[in-house]
Curated annotation (Swiss-Prot):
Entry keyword annotation includes Zinc: no
Function noted in UniProt: Peptidoglycan polymerase that is essential for cell division.
Periplasmic-side segments: 34-43, 96-100, 158-160, 203-271, 323-333
EC number of the protein: 2.4.99.28
Any GO CC annotation of this UniProt entry: plasma membrane
Organism in which the protein naturally occurs: Borreliella burgdorferi (strain ATCC 35210 / DSM 4680 / CIP 102532 / B31) (Borrelia burgdorferi)
Name of the protein described by the UniProt record: Probable peptidoglycan glycosyltransferase FtsW
A molecular function (GO) term: peptidoglycan glycosyltransferase activity
Domain of life: Bacteria
Record keywords: Cell cycle, Cell division, Cell inner membrane, Cell membrane, Cell shape, Cell wall biogenesis/degradation, Glycosyltransferase, Membrane, Peptidoglycan synthesis, Transferase, Transmembrane, Transmembrane helix
Catalytic activity, reaction form: [GlcNAc-(1->4)-Mur2Ac(oyl-L-Ala-gamma-D-Glu-L-Lys-D-Ala-D-Ala)](n)-di-trans,octa-cis-undecaprenyl diphosphate + beta-D-GlcNAc-(1->4)-Mur2Ac(oyl-L-Ala-gamma-D-Glu-L-Lys-D-Ala-D-Ala)-di-trans,octa-cis-undecaprenyl diphosphate = [GlcNAc-(1->4)-Mur2Ac(oyl-L-Ala-gamma-D-Glu-L-Lys-D-Ala-D-Ala)](n+1)-di-trans,octa-cis-undecaprenyl diphosphate + di-trans,octa-cis-undecaprenyl diphosphate + H(+)
Cytoplasmic topological domain residue ranges: 1-12, 65-74, 122-136, 179, 293-301, 355-364
Length: 364
C-alpha cells in the first residue's frame, strides 16, 4: 500500500476513529450481561465506558497539541511521578493476586499504563541523541537499561508478570530499531531470559498457567477452562458469526469476557470476517504510525511515533494470540476494545502523540 505524505494524517485518523467506534460496539455487546448482573442496569458499564471515552478524547487533544519539546524537557519529573505511583500500588489491596492499581475516591488508576507514556517519551528523548559513529559503546546504554530495569522489577513485584514481559519485548524491539549493536541486543536478551525464568518459577501459579496453556485439556474445567472456552467461542462464530448481541460466551461462560477475552466475544458474534476486520485495523494503525514516524522531521519525533504505534500494536497482537491459544492467558487487554479506564486513556494519549507528529511531515 502506497500512501501520499499529505494523506498519511487523514488515513491514520480514519483508522483511529474506526478502532474507537468498533471497540465501542464490541464492548457494549460484551458487557451487557455483566452490567445487568452487577448493577441491574444492562447499560451501566457502557455508559461508564462512554465517560472514560470522552475523557480519553480530551487527553488525546492535549497530547496532540502539546509541545513535544516541552515533553522532552520535562521527562525526568514525569518518570519520578510514575515511579512513585507504581510504588504506591504496594499500599493498595491485591486484586486477583496482583497489586496493579491505586484506589482513590472510587476511582482506580493503573500506574503501569502511565509508564507506557513515560517510557515512550524518555526513550525517544534519549535515543534522539544517539549517534552510532560516536557512542555505540555499552556505556552509552547503561543509563536507559538501568532506568528500565528499575521499573521492570517493580512491575514484576506487583505480580504483574505479563505486563513486565510486554515491556521487555517492547524495549528490545526499540533497542534493535535504534541501531544498537546487534551483539549488545543479543547479550541483553540472553541475560534477560534466565532472570525472567527465575521470576516465573518463584510463583507456582505462573508455572501452572504455562502448563495449562501447553495442555489445556488436562484440566478442562480448571486452569485450562479459559483457553478452551475462548477457542470454542471463536470456532462457533464461523465466517459471519452468530450476530451482534447473539453470542453466548459472554453470558458468564468465559471470565473476563469484556476485558482480557473480548476478542473471543468479537469472534463468536461477528465471525472470521469481524476478526479479520479488527486485525486489519490494528495492522493499518501500525502501518500508518510507522510511516508517520519515518516521514517525521526529527529523530525524536520518529521515536515518539514509532514507539507509540508499536506499544499499541504489540499489546493488541499479544491479546489476540492469547485469545487464539498461542500465548498463555494473562492480564493483557485489547486496546480500544477491552474495559479499563486507564487503558483507554493511555491508548488515546499515545494515539495523540502520533497525531502530533503527523502534523509536520517531511518527504525525506
Amino acid at each position: 500500500m502506497v500512501v501520499e505524505i499529505n494523506s498519511l494524517r487523514t488515513c491514520y485518523l480514519l483508522v483511529l476513529l474506526l478502532l474507537v467506534a468498533y471497540g465501542l460496539v464490541v464492548f457494549y455487546t460484551s458487557s451487557f450481561f455483566l452490567s445487568l448482573e452487577l448493577t441491574g442496569n444492562p447499560n451501566f458499564l457502557f455508559f461508564t465506558r462512554l465517560n472514560y471515552l470522552f475523557l480519553s478524547f480530551m487527553v488525546f487533544l492535549v497530547f496532540e497539541r502539546i509541545s513535544l519539546n516541552f515533553l522532552k524537557k520535562s521527562i525526568f519529573p514525569v518518570l519520578i511521578i510514575t515511579l512513585f505511583l507504581i510504588m504506591a500500588t504496594f499500599l493498595s489491596p491485591s486484586i486477583s493476586g496482583a497489586k496493579r492499581w491505586i484506589f482513590f475516591q472510587g476511582v482506580s488508576i493503573q500506574p503501569s499504563e502511565i509508564f507506557k507514556i513515560s517510557f515512550t517519551i524518555y526513550l525517544s528523548a534519549y535515543l534522539s541523541k544517539f549517534d552510532p559513529r560516536k557512542n555505540n559503546g555499552i556505556s552509552y546504554w547503561i543509563k536507559p537499561m538501568l532506568i528500565f530495569a528499575i521499573f521492570w522489577v517493580l512491575i514484576i513485584l506487583q505480580n504483574d508478570y505479563s505486563t513486565a514481559i510486554y515491556f521487555a519485548i517492547l524495549f528490545f524491539i526499540v533497542l534493535f530499531v535504534s541501531n544498537m549493536a546487534f551483539s549488545y541486543v543479543f547479550a541483553i536478551v540472553v541475560t534477560f531470559l534466565p532472570v525472567s525464568a527465575i521470576f516465573l518459577m518463584l510463583e507456582p501459579y505462573r508455572v501452572s498457567r504455562i502448563f495449562a496453556f501447553l495442555n489445556p485439556y488436562d484440566d478442562p474445567s480448571g486452569k485450562g477452562y479459559q483457553i478452551i472456552a475462548s477457542l470454542n467461542a471463536l470456532k462457533s462464530g464461523g465466517i459471519l458469526g452468530k450476530g451482534l448481541g447473539m453470542g453466548e460466551v459472554k453470558l458468564g461462560k468465559l471470565p473476563e469476557a469484556n476485558s482480557d477475552f473480548i476478542f473471543s466475544v468479537l469472534g463468536e458474534e461477528l465471525g472470521f470476517l469481524g476478526v479479520l476486520f479488527a486485525i486489519s485495523l490494528f495492522f493499518l494503525f501500525f502501518y500508518f504510525g510507522y510511516f508517520i514516524a519515518i516521514h517525521s522531521n526529527s529523530r525524536f519525533k520518529f521515536f515518539i511515533a514509532f514507539i507509540s504505534s508499536l506499544a499499541i500494536f504489540l499489546q493488541s497482537m499479544m491479546n489476540i494470540l492469547i485469545a487464539i491459544g498461542l500465548l498463555p492467558p494473562t492480564g493483557i487487554n485489547l486496546p480500544f476494545f477491552s474495559s479499563g479506564g486507564s487503558s483507554i486513556i493511555v491508548t488515546m494519549a499515545l494515539s495523540g502523540l502520533i497525531s502530533n507528529v503527523s502534523k509536520n511531515l517531511s518527504n525525506n
